[in-house]
């Protein structure tokens, strides 16, 4: 899944929200993506565990980047927007690194569906989500 030299979504792309979150992509291509995030105190909720919104944001960002890469490698450009994000929280953690991996479930002309799994330092699943994305035509 390493990006090719002509990848439509290079690893060094800067997305302000992802940067604020601390999300770093390690692999990106039309068939999937991987990213990691260092759990810091500002990402914790009152009880001291990672806020569920962090996982929702990771899942949508990772799925969106992979979907964008696929759309632009199999079409005439364009973009994607999330239309549904269904995230399940499996296990709570309060520190360490988390790793997200996206895999396609459906990639069609109008929509895509991606599954993202987030694991901790010991490879335990901490969250899992599906994101449905709408493919948008390139603007003239």
Curated annotation (Swiss-Prot):
Its EC number is 3.1.2.-. GO terms for molecular function: 1,4-dihydroxy-2-naphthoyl-CoA thioesterase activity. GO terms for cellular component: cytosol. The keyword Phosphoprotein does not apply. InterPro entries: HotDog_dom_sf (IPR029069), PAAI_dom (IPR003736), Thioestr_dom (IPR006683). Pfam families: 4HBT. The keyword Oxidoreductase does not apply. Keywords: Hydrolase. Was identified as a high-confidence drug target. Belongs to the thioesterase PaaI family. This is Putative esterase Rv1847. The lineage of its organism: Bacteria, Bacillati, Actinomycetota, Actinomycetes, Mycobacteriales.
